[in-house]
């Protein structure tokens, strides 16, 4: 209850404020605290489906033919409450899908269409997503009908694909299998700006230097998907906009040809909406009144639908026939000269000079009215930028080629964050594998696992070498876009074999041994690398008095150079690894924050992170063999010594440099150990210390080993989608 609520004669029976209102959070009181909440998202407490619900199994029961029929019908069934432009919702549905998928960025794999996050803040209320709430409501009868067999994430992505089909494009295919989340992600960094559409140079700007966009961002402004359609900071200049386009599309793994295809293909159909006063629009969905029921941007002053809709503020269609897949975009863009104009809403747009009457698109509600087509500053970049122009000319001259390139690029856009093809479900999954899917051939399970382990144990490899190599192979996994991991053994290929973080000299030595063992059996190198890590852990556990077998699932395959897109793997290169106590260089972000981000991408919880780091320290897996954080007299033994000594009050901690500390005996002041911020945070952060104390207890030595093995196995199997 609010303290400003009307007094109705009695006191509110609910304790004021704290539980239901947004009060000052711990992170606001203590901004330097670690936000461990990012490790504890999307659990059973927020998911209404129950622990036994498996969407990937449920969607296999979906009647795709019936769904497709219903989706095609929806496209042309205009609703009075939100009219379809020209009687077809295709343009709206394409924008819906595009703006869901278009949040993906390759730097950290976050964003994209894979979770249905467009339903939640902040994305559902971004200025670039004005009126997409209406598109989702139009889809609700479909979602309601197919229920648990169809996620919102799949439906939103599918809507654009069906829209293109209904307007004449031969699509490349579609895969189901995206699982919904039930609250906004807490781990995705969208920028530091304090206002929507803040221009460059404003407080918290994402730009520095000569228009260098901050990593990992892939949009030019807070609240946009890609670029500002009016120009850089709203100032039209197609060549400057071309620079922004190239950067943003590269950051979502698109080359120049794919960029032109997606820009042109996205604007071949549909229109922009700006026929009115944007100031008359109500609040966005998250800020709207309760009676608006999740609708935002309502125009309660004017009609606000059909020809009077205001979305981006730009007004008009790009082509003569906006409900047909054709070559009209390039025909108008390249055959006419264009001049700057202002839309009725006051937005900059380009309009053709002396356009022929037959090239004018008709009004969305009255076909007897002809209107002027438009281009955005981004469209003009396709004509003015020399490289984009070459591609545009080719597409203009060869409609079939344009259609093929676009269909493939659209498939890539809407599936980029789904991971390898093994995760694809449905009758329309293309047979052809794409290199951006990071293909891995099937591996063998027909070999004697124990015999391979015996050969590994008999080699001269140390526990540290075996565990470190297996870890390095697996740590590249990102749950965000399902890339990386141990499957494929790409650690033996360029570029990974040469990454500084993989210690090329040590890696080469270890791989020479493990590849020889693999060659002498039917096992893949990928399996042997993981098995070697398991052997090392078993030896370290035995040294601590625990005889155990680390779980193992065979069947990993070995990728080849031909299956590996070198450039796309650069973003997976580790530039830090708290688990091996290593930083490639000093960064503005603290070492413990970097560790937290990597942990979230790997899909680990806070206690799994805790037990893994404590175990890897005492095993001796530090990068370069450093002794920082190795808080034990028995290196190579899987003991709980790290936590015992970390929580021991007989020691004090003193800084000796940037990210370096000495642990000194309180009585003698003699240096006992050295450590980094990543080590110390498990004693300083109250939550992590609580976990550290659990593992330091005298009665939890076995629990520590068991939990370490469980977390280790989770990392090794993170990319084994064939086991799910």
Curated annotation (Swiss-Prot):
> Where does cross-link Tryptophyl-tyrosyl-methioninium (Trp-Tyr) (with M-252) occur?
98-226
Q: Which reaction does this chain catalyze?
A: H2O2 + AH2 = A + 2 H2O; 2 H2O2 = O2 + 2 H2O
GO cellular component annotations of the record: cytosol
What InterPro entries does UniProt report for this protein, alphabetically?
A: Catalase_peroxidase (IPR000763), Haem_peroxidase (IPR002016), Haem_peroxidase_sf (IPR010255), Peroxidases_AS (IPR019794)
- Site feature (Transition state stabilizer) residues: 95
Question: Which cofactors does this gene product need?
Answer: heme b
Note whether DNA repair occurs among the keywords: no
Bound cofactor: record note: Binds 1 heme b (iron(II)-protoporphyrin IX) group per dimer.
Top-level taxon of origin: Bacteria
Q: Which residues form the active site?
A: 99
Any idea which UniProt keywords this protein has? Heme, Hydrogen peroxide, Iron, Metal-binding, Oxidoreductase, Peroxidase
Cross-link Tryptophyl-tyrosyl-methioninium (Tyr-Met) (with W-98), where in sequence: 226-252
Task: Output the PTM entry.
Answer: Formation of the three residue Trp-Tyr-Met cross-link is important for the catalase, but not the peroxidase activity of the enzyme.
Instruction: Give GO terms: molecular function aspect only.
Output: catalase activity; heme binding; metal ion binding
Q: Which GO terms describe its biological process?
A: cellular response to hydrogen peroxide; hydrogen peroxide catabolic process
One Pfam family of this chain? peroxidase
Which positions does UniProt annotate for heme b binding?
267
Enzyme Commission code: 1.11.1.21
Alphabetized PROSITE patterns for the sequence:
PEROXIDASE_2, PEROXIDASE_4
PANTHER family the record matches: CATALASE-PEROXIDASE, HYDROPEROXIDASE I, BIFUNCTIONAL CATALASE-PEROXIDASE
Subunit description: Homodimer or homotetramer.
Protein family according to the UniProt entry: Belongs to the peroxidase family. Peroxidase/catalase subfamily.
User: What name goes with this protein?
Assistant: Catalase-peroxidase
Question: What organism does this protein naturally occur in?
Answer: Psychromonas ingrahamii (strain DSM 17664 / CCUG 51855 / 37)
């Amino acid at each position: 209850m609010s303290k400003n609520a009307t007094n109705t004669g009695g006191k509110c029976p609910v304790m004021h404020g704290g539980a239901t209102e947004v009060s000052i959070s711990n992170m606001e009181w203590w901004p330097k605290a670690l936000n461990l909440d990012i490790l504890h998202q999307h659990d059973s407490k927020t998911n209404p489906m129950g622990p036994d619900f498996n969407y990937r199994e449920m969607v296999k029961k979906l009647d795709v033919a019936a769904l497709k029929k219903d989706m095609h019908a929806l496209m042309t069934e205009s609703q009075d409450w939100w009219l379809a432009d020209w009687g077809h919702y295709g343009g709206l549905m394409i924008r819906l899908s595009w703006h869901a998928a278009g949040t993906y960025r390759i730097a950290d794999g976050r964003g994209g269409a894979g979770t249905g996050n467009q339903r939640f803040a902040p994305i559902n209320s971004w200025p670039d997503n004005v009126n997409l709430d209406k598109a989702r409501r139009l889809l609700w009868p479909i979602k309601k009908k197919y229920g648990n067999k169809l996620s919102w994430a799949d439906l939103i992505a599918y809507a654009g694909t069906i829209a293109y089909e209904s307007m004449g494009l031969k699509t490349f295919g579609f895969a189901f299998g995206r699982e919904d989340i039930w609250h906004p992600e807490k781990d995705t960094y969208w920028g530091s700006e304090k206002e929507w559409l803040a221009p460059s140079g404003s407080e918290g700007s994402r730009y520095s230097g000569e228009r260098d966009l901050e990593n990992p961002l892939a949009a030019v402004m807070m609240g946009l998907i890609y670029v500002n359609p009016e120009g850089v900071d709203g100032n039209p200049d197609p060549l400057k906009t071309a620079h922004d386009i190239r950067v943003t599309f590269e950051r979502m793994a698109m080359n120049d040809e794919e960029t032109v295809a997606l820009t042109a293909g996205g604007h071949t159909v549909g229109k922009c909406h700006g026929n009115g006063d944007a100031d008359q629009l109500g609040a966005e969905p998250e800020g709207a009144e309760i009676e608006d029921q999740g609708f935002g941007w309502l125009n309660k002053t004017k009609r606000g639908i059909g020809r009077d809709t205001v979305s981006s503020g730009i007004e008009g269609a790009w082509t003569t026939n906006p409900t047909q897949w054709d070559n009209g975009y390039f025909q108008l863009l390249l055959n006419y000269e264009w001049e700057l104009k202002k839309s009725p809403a006051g937005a900059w747009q380009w309009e053709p000079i002396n356009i022929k009457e037959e090239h004018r698109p008709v009004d969305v509600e009255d076909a007897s009215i002809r209107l002027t087509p438009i281009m955005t500053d981004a469209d003009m970049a396709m004509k003015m930028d020399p490289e984009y122009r070459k591609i545009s000319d080719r597409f203009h001259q060869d409609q079939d080629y344009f259609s093929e390139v676009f269909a493939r690029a659209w498939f890539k856009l809407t599936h980029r964050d789904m991971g390898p093809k093994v995760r694809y479900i449905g009758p329309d999954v293309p047979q052809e594998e794409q290199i951006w899917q990071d293909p891995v051939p099937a591996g063998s399970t027909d070999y004697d696992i124990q015999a391979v382990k015996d050969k590994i144990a008999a080699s001269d490899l140390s526990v540290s070498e075996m565990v470190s190599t297996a870890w390095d192979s697996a740590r590249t996994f990102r749950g965000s876009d399902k890339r990386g991991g141990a499957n494929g053994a790409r650690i033996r290929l360029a570029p990974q074999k040469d990454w500084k973080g993989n210690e090329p000299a040590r890696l080469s030595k270890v791989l020479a041994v493990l590849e020889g063992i693999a060659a002498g059996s039917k096992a893949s190198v990928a399996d042997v690398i993981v098995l070697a890590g398991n052997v090392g852990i078993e030896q370290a556990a035995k040294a601590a008095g625990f005889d155990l077998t680390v779980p193992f699932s065979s069947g990993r395959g070995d990728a080849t150079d031909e299956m590996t897109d070198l450039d796309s793997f650069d973003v997976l290169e580790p530039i830090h690894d708290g688990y091996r106590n290593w930083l490639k260089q000093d960064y503005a972000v603290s070492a413990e924050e970097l560790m937290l981000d990597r942990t979230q991408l790997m899909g680990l919880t806070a206690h799994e992170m805790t037990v893994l780091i404590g175990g890897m320290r005492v095993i001796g897996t530090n990068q370069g063999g450093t002794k920082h954080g190795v808080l034990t007299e028995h290196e190579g033994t899987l003991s709980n010594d790290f936590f015992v000594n970390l929580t021991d009050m007989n020691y004090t901690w003193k800084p000796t440099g940037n990210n370096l500390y000495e642990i000194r005996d309180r009585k003698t002041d003699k240096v006992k150990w050295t450590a980094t911020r990543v080590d110390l945070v498990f004693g300083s952060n109250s939550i992590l210390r609580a976990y550290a104390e659990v593992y330091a207890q005298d009665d939890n030595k076995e629990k520590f080993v068991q939990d370490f093995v469980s977390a280790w196995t989770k990392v090794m199997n993170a990319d084994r989608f064939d086991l799910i």
